[in-house]
Structures are given as structure tokens and as C-alpha cells.
């Protein structure tokens, strides 16, 4: 049961990042404009990096492969995104989004702490 719960947690967390990467790819121009509005420069390059991070981190979680590296990648990305996009914490909406991101980081830290479980490439290799 424990490994099933870990697998479900990995999939649910990964979906967030994978869907985001797909949406950012589809709506690339709008996302670049939003990034520029937040004071970011080199937005095409940075958006490409963000999409790559979300895809590789998300796939790492789903496959349970190089899970710790994928989790650390996603934690760093989520923390940076939180500081860039949610600076006005006295605004209720911004505070709520920042707290949600911190909760996501908490879930990722749990995966880092307990590992990918047995349903994943890392778990299968460790069982050998």
C-alpha cells in the first residue's frame, strides 16, 4: 500500500508540471509577455529552460527514474517561480499562490525523503 501511495503522489505532482509545460509550449507568446511584465529578460531562452525543467522533472517523477535529481530540479524551479511571481504577500491572492507553491515543495520534499517506492525504475533497480 505504501508504494502505491508514493506512486500516486508522484503522478499527481508530476501532472502539475507536465500540464504546465504543455500549456507553456502552446501559449508560448503569451507566457513570454507575462514573463517580461514581471521584469524578466531573455524570455524565449528562460521559457525554454522552464519547459525543459518541467518536462524532465515531471517525467522523472512519473517514471521513478533519477527521482531525487528530478525532485531537486522541481523544488529549485518552484522556489524561484514563487519569488519571481508572488512578491506582494500582503495581497491575498498572491499569498495563496505562494502558499500553494510551498505546499508543492513540501510534497516534493516528502518524495525526496522516502524515495520513489518500488513502482519506478529507481525502486526496481534498488530491489535487484
Predicted features, each with a name:
Residues 1-30, 36, 41-56, 62-128:
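Extended, low-polarity transmembrane helix blocks
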Amino acid at each position: 500500500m505504501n508504494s502505491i501511495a508514493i506512486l500516486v503522489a508522484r503522478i499527481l505532482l508530476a501532472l502539475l508540471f507536465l500540464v504546465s509545460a504543455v500549456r507553456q509550449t502552446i501559449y508560448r507568446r503569451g507566457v513570454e509577455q507575462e514573463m517580461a511584465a514581471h521584469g524578466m529578460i531573455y524570455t524565449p531562452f528562460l521559457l525554454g529552460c522552464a519547459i525543459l525543467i518541467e518536462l524532465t522533472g515531471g517525467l522523472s517523477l512519473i517514471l521513478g527514474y533519477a527521482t531525487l535529481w528530478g525532485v531537486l530540479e522541481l523544488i529549485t524551479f518552484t522556489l524561484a517561480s514563487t519569488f519571481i511571481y508572488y512578491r506582494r504577500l500582503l495581497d491575498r491572492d498572491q499569498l495563496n499562490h505562494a502558499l500553494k507553491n510551498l505546499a508543492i515543495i513540501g510534497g516534493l520534499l516528502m518524495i525526496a525523503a522516502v524515495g520513489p517506492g518500488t513502482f519506478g525504475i529507481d525502486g526496481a533497480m534498488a530491489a535487484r
